[in-house]
Amino acid sequence: KNNKQISGLRSKVQSEEEKGFAYQPGGKPGFARTAAAIYSLQVCGKYDDPLVKAGSRYLFKKFSSGERWFTYGNYYAAPAHYMIGGETWKRWYELIGATLKKRAKQDGELTYWSGDIGRIYSTAAHATILAMPYHYLPLYQR
């Protein structure tokens, strides 16, 4: 049943020309939606699915530190690329790591991130992303 539902994604919510995912059929694809979609596919065991690979290419193409849903999108894009592994993960981590370091704010000894979703959530999400290669969380242990 899951395979049938997943295969329906291509015709319903993935943009044929851009390869990103939309929220609803016929909608515009977006960075955060694509990140959540390819991570969800991987969680369902579709690690090598062409939708995941195409979605990853879309995320590299559309990456922007000015993205409206930057934190939310990267909270899913980072583990999706981590699961892809190899050079893809290495390139993604260099890209997101450099971006997050530039966006970090300093208040004395305190380093944090801010955004429209709030300082606490942004800091927790970005610290989790930066910590992925250190395998602190069991989810990211290999």
Where are each of the predicted segments found?
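C-terminal closing repeat unit and adjoining cap/tail of repeat-based domains
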Residues: 92-104
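Large, well-folded core regions of big proteins
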Residues: 105-110
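An alpha-helical repeat/solenoid feature that recognizes helix-turn-helix modules
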Residues: 1-57, 62-95, 111-142
